[in-house]
Amino acid sequence: MKLFFIVLISFLSLLQASKGFDFDEKELETEENVWKLYERWRGHHSVSRASHEAIKRFNVFRHNVLHVHRTNKKNKPYKLKINRFADITHHEFRSSYAGSNVKHHRMLRGPKRGSGGFMYENVTRVPSSVDWREKGAVTEVKNQQDCGSCWAFSTVAAVEGINKIRTNKLVSLSEQELVDCDTEENQGCAGGLMEPAFEFIKNNGGIKTEETYPYDSSDVQFCRANSIGGETVTIDGHEHVPENDEEELLKAVAHQPVSVAIDAGSSDFQLYSEGVFIGECGTQLNHGVVIVGYGETKNGTKYWIVRNSWGPEWGEGGYVRIERGISENEGRCGIAMEASYPTKLSSTPSTHESVVRDDVKDEL
């Protein structure tokens, strides 16, 4: 009975956090009312701020609330909300949550690697809509927290997806292993790319489960993988989607979740709530996400279903629908510029029990 109430309380807390936080115009009429709104928002999101920061945070909150209010009064296909990012500046948001400079990491890494092929090149027909969540190939939305590990979350989500598709087994995998251990070309909480992460998983014989190597958002980069037993999920390699081509990207997403990089640094993206995102964003790729489907609204607006790693309270339960099929080849927010996916051709079970190496045992 005690366990039941603990589970119930946890569920209700999550439900409350994921619900929208609404306000009306009367709460914006005076500074006193906005202060009360800010206090209500802090309670809703369990936000604690140091006393010396109170004025600064309130002013930032007021600015963001007014932006949300003005934007939502316009006739746009998406809405904003005062989510948990509402009292941080645009610069702070970019630094903490959209600061993985893909161009910088690409320059350090050099030319793209992989198999050199695109297995979906000859696909001629795809379904009008696909949602890998409905097919059971997507785990629950996760939260990278204050760590620039989006690349690890994007990589893991794509691997979880293809593993489910090939083996009919959905296993939540370890982002923390990538943060701690994939350090030759990626930089933990300082950012990275999905491609070398796919290579790491292949070359190291797979990746641990989240259960055995849980996420803690730390960036000490002390690799514990060799001292942990349990299941390991493997892949065969990875491929790239031809860049700047949404039609080719569509072929890939029709067959599996695909890792992509986007420009997620705009104020509207920071405060996104629901709808098809057509807001301002460039092609300065700074955030790794994964496309888990696509579709079209009743009024004919095409979109990608994109899974983020900022927790379920952001956006549409942790997801954003981004406009698809625009005139620019790069796609909205550069979504077609850096797309890749893991390959796994075998339909045999992909998990195996790993053992602690003898040399590691000796050290324990």
Curated annotation (Swiss-Prot):
UniProt-annotated glycosylation sites, renumbered to this chain: 122
Keywords: Disulfide bond, Endoplasmic reticulum, Glycoprotein, Hydrolase, Protease, Signal, Thiol protease, Zymogen
Transmembrane regions: none
UniProt xrefs under Gene3D superfamilies: Cysteine proteinases
Compartment annotation: Endoplasmic reticulum
Coarse class of the protein's main subcellular location: endoplasmic reticulum
Motif (Prevents secretion from ER): 361-364
GO CC annotation, single: endoplasmic reticulum
Biased composition (Polar residues): 343-353
Gene Ontology molecular function terms on file: cysteine-type peptidase activity
Disulfide-bonded cysteines: 147-189, 181-223, 281-333
Active site: 150, 287, 308
Propeptide: 21-125
Tissue: Expressed in roots, stems, flowers, buds, green siliques, trichomes and near the stomata of cotyledons but not of true leaves. Found at the hypocotyl-root transition zone, in the vascular tissue, along primary and lateral roots, but not in root tips. Never found in the abscission zone of flower organs.
GO annotation, biological process: proteolysis; response to nutrient levels
E.C. designation(s): 3.4.22.-
Signal peptide: 1-20
Composition bias, Basic and acidic residues: 354-364
Coiled-coil spans in chain: none
Region named Disordered: 343-364
Role summary: Involved in the final stage of developmental programmed cell death and in intercalation of new cells. Cleaves extensins, thus probably supporting the final cell collapse.
Family note: Belongs to the peptidase C1 family.
Protein name stated in the entry: KDEL-tailed cysteine endopeptidase CEP3
Annotated source species: Arabidopsis thaliana (Mouse-ear cress)
Gene name of the record: CEP3
